[in-house]
Curated annotation (Swiss-Prot):
Protein's UniProt name: CMP-N-acetylneuraminate-beta-galactosamide-alpha-2,3-sialyltransferase 1
One GO term of the biological process aspect: sialylation
Tree of life domain: Eukaryota
InterPro entries, A to Z: Beta-gal_alpha2-3_sialyltrans, Glyco_trans_29, GT29-like_sf, Sialyl_trans
Pathway annotation from the record: Protein modification; protein glycosylation
Family: Belongs to the glycosyltransferase 29 family.
Gene: ST3GAL1
Native organism: Gallus gallus
Disulfide bonds: 61-66, 63-141, 144-283
Membrane topology according to the record: Single-pass type II membrane protein
Top enzyme category: transferase
Length: 342
C-alpha cells in the first residue's frame, strides 16, 4: 500500500513538471522569437504557468467521474455532506448531544449505560481505524459493490461482476455459499447489528451498526467476558472476529442519513440504505445489486423459496418505497449504477 502511494506521488510529480515545462514552452514560443533571450522574462512566464496549474482544482479521485464531486445535481448537492464521518473511531468518539438524544429513541432503550464510558472501553479493545476503507487518496479509483439481499439476485448471474470490485459490501445474513454465480463469493466488509450477527471469514471487516448503547456494550463483552446474551432477542455471547476487523458505524451518520436523505420518512433508515449512503462517502464508484422487488413484484430474500416472504417490508420501521426511490434517483443522476436483477 505504501509502495503504491510512493509510486503514485513520483508519477504525479513527474507529470506535473512535464506538463508545466511543456505548457511554458508552448506558450513562450508564441510570445517571443528565437532571437529574444531574457532570463527574467522566462522565469516570470514559468512562474505564471506554475501558478495556473496550482490553481486548477484537484479532483477527489482518479475515476472518470467521482461521486463526491458536486455541481451536477442540485438534488444531490442539497443532501450530500462530505464532512460527515461514517466511522466512529477513537479520534472522533464524541456523539453530539442532539444526535445522541435522537439515537437513544430509535429502539426505546431504557436506562442506557453512560455513552462516554462505553466508547472509552470499546476503543480500548478495538482500534477502529485501521481499515483500507478509511484511507483516502486522490490517486485512487475505488470501485465498490453494495450487495443487498433481494430475491431479484436469483438467476441474475451477477456473481463474477460483483467479485471484480475492489470492495464488496454485504449486510445481515447474506449467504454466499451455494449462490456464488448470482451473488459472488467475495466479501470485504459486512454490515451487522447484534441481532443479525453471522460468523464471517477471517479477512472480512465487520461494520457494526449500533441502534442503541446496548449494541456497543455487546461488542465489548462479545470480545471479552461474554456477559451479554440478550437484547430484545438472544444474541451470541462471544463472536469470532479479529479486533482490528471490527468497525463502528457512526450514530451521527445514521441521523444524517435519516434527515438528509430520507427527509424523516419512517422511524429510521434500513441497513440497506445505510450501506448505500455509507458507500457514497468512502467509495469513488458504487454499483448496487440486490435491492428492490423482483420482476414479479415480490419482496423476498434470494435464499428464500417462498417468493411472498416479504413481511419484513411491512414492519412500519422503514419506509421501503421512499428508500427505494432515493436509490433510483441516485442511479438516475449517475451517482450509482443500479442493477435490477431478475
Amino acid at each position: 500500500m505504501v509502495t503504491v502511494r510512493k509510486r503514485n506521488v513520483k508519477v504525479f510529480t513527474f507529470a506535473f513538471v512535464l506538463i508545466t515545462v511543456t505548457s511554458f514552452l508552448l506558450n513562450y514560443k508564441h510570445q517571443v522569437t528565437m532571437t529574444t533571450w531574457d532570463p527574467k522574462h522566462i522565469i516570470s512566464q514559468f512562474s505564471e504557468q506554475v501558478r495556473k496549474l496550482i490553481k486548477f482544482p484537484r479532483r477527489p479521485c482518479s475515476c472518470s467521474t467521482c461521486i463526491s464531486e458536486l455541481g451536477h445535481s442540485l438534488w444531490f448537492d442539497q443532501r450530500f455532506n462530505s464532512t460527515m464521518q461514517p466511522f466512529l473511531t477513537s479520534q472522533n468518539a464524541l456523539i453530539p448531544e442532539d444526535s445522541y438524544r435522537w439515537w437513544l429513541k430509535l429502539q426505546g432503550e431504557k436506562s442506557p449505560k453512560n455513552i462516554n464510558d462505553t466508547l472509552k472501553e470499546l476503543f480500548g479493545i478495538i482500534p477502529g481505524d485501521r481499515d483500507p476503507l478509511q484511507e483516502r487518496g486522490t490517486f485512487s479509483c475505488r470501485r465498490c459493490a453494495v450487495v443487498g439481499n433481494s430475491g431479484n439476485l436469483r438467476q441474475s448471474q451477477y456473481g463474477q461482476d460483483i467479485d471484480s470490485h475492489d470492495f464488496v459490501l454485504r449486510m445481515n445474513r447474506a449467504p454466499t455459499i451455494g449462490y456464488e454465480s448470482d451473488v459472488g463469493s467475495k466479501t470485504t466488509h459486512h454490515f451487522v447489528y447484534p441481532e443479525s450477527y453471522k460468523e464471517l471469514a477471517e479477512n472480512v471487516s465487520m461494520i457494526v451498526i449500533p441502534f442503541k448503547t446496548l449494541d456497543l456494550r455487546w461488542i465489548v463483552t462479545a470480545l471479552t467476558t461474554g456477559t451479554i446474551n440478550f437484547t430484545y432477542v438472544p444474541v451470541p455471547r462471544k463472536i469470532k472476529v479479529r479486533k482490528e476487523k471490527v468497525l463502528i458505524y457512526n450514530p451521527s451518520f445514521i441521523k444524517y442519513v435519516y434527515e438528509n436523505w430520507l427527509q424523516n420518512h419512517g422511524r429510521y433508515p434500513s441497513t440497506g440504505l445505510l450501506s448505500v449512503i455509507f458507500a457514497l462517502h468512502v467509495c469513488d464508484e458504487v454499483n448496487v445489486y440486490g435491492f428492490g422487488a423482483d420482476s414479479k413484484g415480490h419482496w423476498h430474500h434470494y435464499w428464500e423459496n417462498n417468493a411472498s416472504a416479504g413481511a419484513f417490508r411491512q414492519t412500519g420501521v422503514h419506509d421501503g418505497d421512499f428508500e427505494f426511490n432515493v436509490t433510483l434517483t441516485l442511479a438516475s443522476i449517475e451517482k450509482i449504477k443500479f442493477f435490477k436483477g431478475r
